[in-house]
Amino acid sequence: MQKLAVYVYIYLFMQILVHPVALDGSSQPTENAEKDGLCNACTWRQNTKSSRIEAIKIQILSKLRLEQAPNISRDVIKQLLPKAPPLQELIDQYDVQRDDSSDGSLEDDDYHATTETIITMPTESDFLVQMEGKPKCCFFKFSSKIQYNKVVKAQLWIYLRQVQKPTTVFVQILRLIKPMKDGTRYTGIRSLKLDMNPGTGIWQSIDVKTVLQNWLKQPESNLGIEIKAFDENGRDLAVTFPGPGEDGLNPFLEVRVTDTPKRSRRDFGLDCDEHSTESRCCRYPLTVDFEAFGWDWIIAPKRYKANYCSGECEFVFLQKYPHTHLVHQANPRGSAGPCCTPTKMSPINMLYFNGKEQIIYGKIPAMVVDRCGCS
């Protein structure tokens, strides 16, 4: 008898959910009730969207290991941002994110960002300051991220000023060392000869992978480098300390590292738009605009599609999520019930300034909601 009563109760409960009964006794919902339901759903989604945006801001800072957003103005960024081929390629050909069914899951992502490319601008070391006859550039301080990854490429980029007629340019890169007994302070890294034609200046890249690897193994040996580039008349063409009109032409190091890709799983779920009347757990579109935050330190993307999850995980809908339903039935008091949450997420690539005014190109995991489900 008790079992029969339970079944009757469940049946009536399901009927109420599917066909709500108005208080006046009519079997059809009133027009006001429908409007109220839609308004409540819109309000709930708006609150979920706002919470998602705030969570994204916190996650980005945390995953990039930043205590706060770097305080870099647009004017400073204009001065620091190299006008160089590798950076332009990253910006022009930027793959903001992909919104497809490619494999990837929340569980398989690491928490912190994965670094792929680091662009390091020169600074001045104490050793360079103490030297007599200030050398022509440059000391590079390396991010700790480089030391924990496999370096696959390291190039020094220098800008050579324009020439008035066809000429041969002699480029020499020297590594500073502690003074020898004979007074020697340099050892050669690379020498090359270039033929330049009249017109605009050019960017020239030089492989310094071996030097970088030695510096990483023995940080105390990193005392800086000197850059020389003279034409046939002895005119210095290398931009080492940019003058007027030479913003963005500083020498810099482009370092690329690699990480082992992780295996992933496939998942499925509902997709909805902002005008959808779907009440079940569903994925909704959400575009995050970094410029609206005032986050100028993010070079690219300026915005990206983050998406968010919203909707109900009621008993009558649990046939779509049978595993979660069975777990809940086995231990009904173990939780407050299933919630609509991301079940599959993918990373975004990001080009940004860190707190040390270094330009980092990396991958931030779990920033795009690809699938939603009840769990």
From Swiss-Prot:
Where in the cell does this protein reside?
Answer: Secreted
- Which CDD domains does the UniProt entry name for this protein? TGF_beta_GDF8
Tell me which SUPFAM superfamilies the record gives. Answer: Cystine-knot cytokines (SSF57501)
Q: Which UniProt keywords apply?
A: Cleavage on pair of basic residues, Cytokine, Disulfide bond, Glycoprotein, Growth factor, Secreted, Signal
Q: Which GO terms describe its biological process?
A: cellular response to dexamethasone stimulus; muscle cell cellular homeostasis; muscle cell proliferation; myoblast migration involved in skeletal muscle regeneration; negative regulation of insulin receptor signaling pathway; negative regulation of myoblast differentiation; negative regulation of myoblast proliferation; negative regulation of phosphatidylinositol 3-kinase/protein kinase B signal transduction
Per the UniProt entry, the propeptide covers 24-266
Q: Which domain of life is it from?
A: Eukaryota
What InterPro entries does the entry give? Cystine-knot_cytokine, TGF-b_C, TGF-b_propeptide, TGF-beta-rel, TGFb_CS
Query: Any idea which GO molecular function terms this record carries?
Result: cytokine activity; growth factor activity; heparin binding; protein homodimerization activity; protein serine/threonine kinase activator activity
Known Pfam families for this protein? Answer: TGF_beta (PF00019), TGFb_propeptide (PF00688)
Q: Where is the signal peptide?
A: 1-23
Q: Would you list which residues are glycosylated?
A: 71
Recorded GO cellular component terms are: extracellular space
Disulfide pairs here are 272-282, 281-340, 309-372, 313-374
Task: Give the record's subunit note.
Answer: Homodimer; disulfide-linked.
Q: Per its database record, what is this protein's job?
A: Acts specifically as a negative regulator of skeletal muscle growth.
Q: Do you know which PANTHER family this protein is assigned to? A: GROWTH_DIFFERENTIATION FACTOR 8, TGF-BETA FAMILY
Q: Which family does it belong to?
A: Belongs to the TGF-beta family.
The protein's name is Growth/differentiation factor 8
Native source species: Meleagris gallopavo
